[in-house]
């Protein structure tokens, strides 16, 4: 009974969990050329710091070294990592929106709207490099928001 009450109070977390599971179950079946290039660079260790997708091959190489023992192809493993990072993006979006509006139905609808958009789902389910920088961008905005809420910025005006 208490679990159902907590789930009702925090429906947006359930939406985030369901979307993350959906991303992980519905990985892209026809990846683009960049996805193959990223997987090859991550697996081989060559061209790790390509200016085209700076640091993504390095990130992929770390993922493959940490979870390479799992019975997945490198492309699938990197797609799963992107799905998990996409779930992290949705958590950050929820945290930022909660400061603006506390109503759970608003949070639930907003997270669903962001998480179910085509662009977000495409990069969450494919081996593309855009979801990881989005996560770090949202993380930096979240911490900027925390700073601005806790500290007064009046000293900037002097």
Where are these regions (language model features)?
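Short acidic/glycine- and proline-prone juxtamembrane loop motifs at membrane-interface regions
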Residues: 122-130
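Start-transfer (signal-anchor) and selected internal transmembrane alpha helices
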Residues: 1-22
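Specific aromatic-rich, kink-prone transmembrane helix
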Residues: 92, 116, 120, 132-150, ...
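Loop-to-helix entry region of an early transmembrane alpha helix in multi-pass inner-membrane enzymes
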Residues: 54, 69-91, 123
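Membrane-helix interface segments
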Residues: 74, 102-108, 150-157
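Transmembrane-helix motifs of polytopic, lipid-linked glycan transferases
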Residues: 80-101, 139, 143
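Transmembrane-helix signature of polytopic, membrane-embedded enzymes
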Residues: 93-116
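Extracytoplasmic catalytic/substrate-binding loops of multi-pass membrane glycan-assembly enzymes
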Residues: 25-40, 47-63
């Amino acid at each position: 009974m208490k679990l159902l009450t907590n789930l009702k109070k925090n429906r947006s977390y359930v939406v985030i969990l369901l979307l993350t599971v959906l991303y992980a179950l519905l990985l892209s079946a026809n990846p683009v050329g960049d996805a193959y290039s990223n997987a090859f660079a991550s697996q081989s260790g060559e061209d790790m710091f390509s200016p085209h997708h700076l640091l993504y091959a390095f990130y992929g190489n770390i993922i493959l070294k940490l979870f390479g023992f799992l019975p997945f192809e490198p492309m699938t493993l990197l797609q799963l990592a992107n799905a998990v990072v996409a779930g992290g993006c949705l958590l950050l979006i929820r945290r930022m929106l909660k400061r603006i509006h506390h109503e759970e139905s608003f949070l639930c609808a907003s997270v669903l709207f962001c998480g179910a958009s085509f662009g977000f789902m495409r990069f969450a389910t494919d081996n593309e490099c855009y979801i990881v920088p989005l996560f770090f961008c949202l993380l930096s905005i979240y911490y900027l928001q925390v700073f601005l809420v806790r500290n007064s910025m009046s000293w900037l005006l002097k």
